[in-house]
C-alpha cells in the first residue's frame, strides 16, 4: 500500500518524537547503577579497616587529621556521583522540548506544501450550473481556465472553417462528433462566463432580462399594458370663466380698517365742533337773516356771503376729509337724508339757529352734527 507524501512526513515526525522521548530515559537508567556502585565501594573501603594485632584501639592508631581527610574524600565521591546524575537529567529535559519544536516545524512545512498543491492542481471541467445557483462566485483561476478553453475552441473552429472552405477538398475528414463536442464546449463556456459576471447584489430586473424564455411562456398579462384611448386627444377641455369684479373687491379686513380710520377722524372733528358751539349761539342773534335751503344732495344754499365762506372752507383739507367720511358713512348706513333734514327744519329755537350757523360755516351737512343736536 503506497503512502502519500503527507503520510510519510507524519510517520517520520512521530518516530523522531518517540526517539527523543525514549533516549533520555535510557541514558538516565545507565547512569544510576554506575553511581551506586562507586558509592558503595568507597564506603566499604573506608568502613572496613584491618584490626590491629596489638591491644590498642583502632581509633587511637589513626590521628584525627586522617579521619577528616577520609570524610572529605567520601563526600567528594558522593558529590561527584550526584553531579554525574544531574547531567543526564538535564539532557532528558531538553531533548523532548527540542523534538517537539522539530515536530511543529515539520507540520508547518506540510501545511505549506498542501496549500501550494491545492492552488497548482488542475481542477476538473466545470459542470453546467443550475438555474437556481446563478449567484455563485467564480474565482480568478476558473476564469483563466475558461479563457484558455475559449482560445482552444477558437483555434479548433478556425481549423474547421479552413477545412470547410470552397478551395479545400478535405471535407470528409471532419466528423460530426467533433463539431458537436465543440459546440457543447462553447455553450458551457459562454454560460459560465455570463454567470461569472453576475455579482451578489444583482437585481431581479437583470435576472429577468438575462434568463432565457421558456417554451410555455405566453408573454406578459394584458393588465400590465396601459389602456390607450385615442378619443381623449380629440376632446377639447372646457374653458373656465373668471369674474374679475370679484377679484377687485376689497376684502373684509380692508373694509374694517377703512371704517376704523373714518371713525377716528369723526371723533377728532366732533371734539373741535363742540368747542365752537358757543360761538355758533352768539352768531345766531346777529345773523338772523342768514337763511338757507338744503338740497337733496346735502348742499346748503344761502346768501352770497355765505357762499363765499363755503368756498373758502371747501378748500380746507380738514373739511375735505370730513366730507369724505360723511359720504362713506351715508353709503354704509342706508338712511334717507331728506327725512332727517326735514325733521331738523321743522324744529324751533336755538337748535335751528345753530343748525343754520353750521350750514353757513361748513357748507355741507354732517351727520355727526345732526346726532349731537338731536339729544
Swiss-Prot record:
<dbReference type="GO" id="GO:0005789">
    <property type="term" value="C:endoplasmic reticulum membrane"/>
</dbReference>
<comment type="function">
    <text>Molecular chaperone which facilitates proper subunit assembly andsurface trafficking of alpha-7 (CHRNA7) and alpha-8 (CHRNA8) nicotinic acetylcholine receptors. May also promote functional expression of homomeric serotoninergic 5-HT3 receptors, and of heteromeric acetylcholine receptors.</text>
</comment>
<feature type="region of interest" description="Disordered">
    <location>
        <begin position="38"/>
        <end position="63"/>
    </location>
</feature>
<dbReference type="InterPro" id="IPR026160">
    <property type="entry name" value="Ric3"/>
</dbReference>
<keyword id="KW-0143">Chaperone</keyword>
<feature type="compositionally biased region" description="Polar residues">
    <location>
        <begin position="286"/>
        <end position="296"/>
    </location>
</feature>
<feature type="signal peptide">
    <location>
        <begin position="1"/>
        <end position="29"/>
    </location>
</feature>
<feature type="compositionally biased region" description="Basic residues">
    <location>
        <begin position="365"/>
        <end position="375"/>
    </location>
</feature>
<protein>
    <recommendedName>
        <fullName>Protein RIC-3</fullName>
    </recommendedName>
</protein>
<feature type="topological domain" description="Lumenal">
    <location>
        <begin position="30"/>
        <end position="90"/>
    </location>
</feature>
<keyword id="KW-0472">Membrane</keyword>
<keyword id="KW-1133">Transmembrane helix</keyword>
<dbReference type="GO" id="GO:2000010">
    <property type="term" value="P:positive regulation of protein localization to cell surface"/>
</dbReference>
<keyword id="KW-0812">Transmembrane</keyword>
<dbReference type="InterPro" id="IPR032763">
    <property type="entry name" value="RIC3_N"/>
</dbReference>
<feature type="topological domain" description="Cytoplasmic">
    <location>
        <begin position="112"/>
        <end position="375"/>
    </location>
</feature>
<dbReference type="Pfam" id="PF15361">
    <property type="entry name" value="RIC3"/>
</dbReference>
<keyword id="KW-0175">Coiled coil</keyword>
<feature type="compositionally biased region" description="Polar residues">
    <location>
        <begin position="38"/>
        <end position="47"/>
    </location>
</feature>
<keyword id="KW-0256">Endoplasmic reticulum</keyword>
<feature type="compositionally biased region" description="Acidic residues">
    <location>
        <begin position="305"/>
        <end position="319"/>
    </location>
</feature>
<feature type="coiled-coil region">
    <location>
        <begin position="135"/>
        <end position="165"/>
    </location>
</feature>
<feature type="region of interest" description="Disordered">
    <location>
        <begin position="251"/>
        <end position="375"/>
    </location>
</feature>
<comment type="similarity">
    <text>Belongs to the ric-3 family.</text>
</comment>
<keyword id="KW-0732">Signal</keyword>
<feature type="transmembrane region" description="Helical">
    <location>
        <begin position="91"/>
        <end position="111"/>
    </location>
</feature>
Amino acid at each position: 500500500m503506497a503512502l502519500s507524501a503527507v503520510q510519510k512526513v507524519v510517520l517520520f515526525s512521530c518516530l523522531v518524537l518517540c526517539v527523543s522521548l525514549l533516549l533520555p530515559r535510557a541514558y538516565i537508567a545507565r547512569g544510576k547503577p554506575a553511581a551506586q556502585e562507586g558509592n558503595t565501594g568507597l564506603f566499604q573501603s573506608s568502613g572496613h579497616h584491618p584490626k590491629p594485632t596489638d591491644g590498642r584501639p583502632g581509633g587511637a592508631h589513626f590521628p584525627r587529621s586522617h579521619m577528616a581527610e577520609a570524610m572529605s574524600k567520601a563526600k567528594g565521591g558522593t558529590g561527584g556521583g550526584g553531579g554525574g546524575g544531574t547531567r543526564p537529567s538535564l539532557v532528558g529535559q531538553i531533548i523532548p522540548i527540542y523534538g517537539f519544536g522539530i515536530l511543529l516545524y515539520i507540520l508547518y512545512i506540510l501545511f505549506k506544501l498542501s496549500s501550494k498543491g491545492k492552488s497548482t492542481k488542475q481542477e476538473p471541467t466545470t459542470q453546467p450550473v443550475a438555474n437556481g445557483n446563478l449567484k455563485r462566485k467564480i474565482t480568478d483561476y476558473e476564469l483563466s481556465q475558461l479563457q484558455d478553453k475559449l482560445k482552444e475552441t477558437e483555434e479548433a473552429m478556425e481549423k474547421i472553417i479552413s477545412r470547410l472552405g470552397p478551395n479545400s477538398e478535405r471535407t470528409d475528414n471532419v466528423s460530426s462528433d467533433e463539431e458537436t463536442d465543440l459546440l457543447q464546449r462553447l455553450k458551457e463556456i459562454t454560460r459560465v462566463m455570463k454567470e461569472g459576471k453576475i455579482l451578489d447584489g444583482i437585481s431581479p430586473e437583470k435576472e429577468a432580462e438575462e434568463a432565457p424564455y421558456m417554451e410555455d411562456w405566453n408573454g406578459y398579462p394584458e393588465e400590465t399594458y396601459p389602456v390607450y384611448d385615442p378619443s381623449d386627444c380629440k376632446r377639447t377641455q372646457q374653458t373656465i370663466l373668471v369674474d374679475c369684479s370679484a377679484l377687485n373687491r376689497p376684502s373684509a379686513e380692508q373694509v374694517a380698517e377703512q371704517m376704523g380710520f373714518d371713525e377716528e377722524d369723526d371723533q377728532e372733528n366732533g371734539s373741535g365742533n363742540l368747542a365752537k358751539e358757543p360761538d355758533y349761539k352768539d352768531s345766531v342773534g346777529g345773523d338772523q337773516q342768514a337763511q338757507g335751503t338744503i338740497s337733496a344732495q346735502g348742499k346748503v344754499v344761502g346768501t352770497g356771503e355765505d357762499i363765499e365762506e363755503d368756498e373758502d372752507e371747501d378748500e380746507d383739507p380738514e373739511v375735505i376729509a370730513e366730507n369724505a367720511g360723511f359720504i362713506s358713512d351715508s353709503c354704509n348706513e342706508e338712511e334717507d337724508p331728506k327725512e332727517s333734514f326735514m325733521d331738523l327744519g321743522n324744529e324751533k329755537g336755538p337748535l335751528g339757529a345753530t343748525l343754520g350757523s353750521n350750514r353757513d360755516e361748513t357748507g355741507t351737512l354732517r351727520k355727526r352734527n345732526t346726532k349731537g343736536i338731536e339729544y
